[in-house]
Amino acid sequence: MSSAATIKQRFGLVGRSDIYDRALNTAARVAATDLTVLITGESGVGKEVFSQIIHSLSSRKHNKFIAVNCGAIPQGTINSELFGHEKGSFTGATADRKGYFESVDGGTIFLDEIGEMPLDTQSYLLRVLESGEFIRVGSSQSQTTD
């Protein structure tokens, strides 16, 4: 397990406080698990940096990492972006497309600004987080992701 000092050195982090060191030590501890992690905090406090630290210290470190700002994705396309879509499922869907969850399978996805998502998308997201299952837009087939 990495100590706060080791993590700071490895990732070029600066700062000194007991709370900061505890947060870094917690990141190292959760990186050793295969659990979904919720990182909370105000905008600009480094949630994405912590997610990258957790990914880099985890067994998933050799797989993809993707950070998604959910607040920047238009409401009409967010389900397609996250879960993918089938050819012909809407105007302009000329081919099947993998969503972020499918393309990062086995890796790490960091979802920022999830509170900005439409409520129906949040319920789809909850299903993915609970069971790893999702359905592409325009499909009736359930798929799984890790």
What is each stretch, according to the model?
Residues 31, 118, 129-130, 137:
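Protein kinase-like catalytic domain
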Residues 88-95, 130-137:
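Short gly/ser/thr-rich secondary-structure transition/capping motifs
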Residues 20-24, 75, 94, 98, ...:
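Amphipathic alpha-helical transducer elements in NTP-driven molecular machines
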Residues 12, 25-91, 102-118:
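Conserved post-Walker A coupling segment in P-loop NTPases
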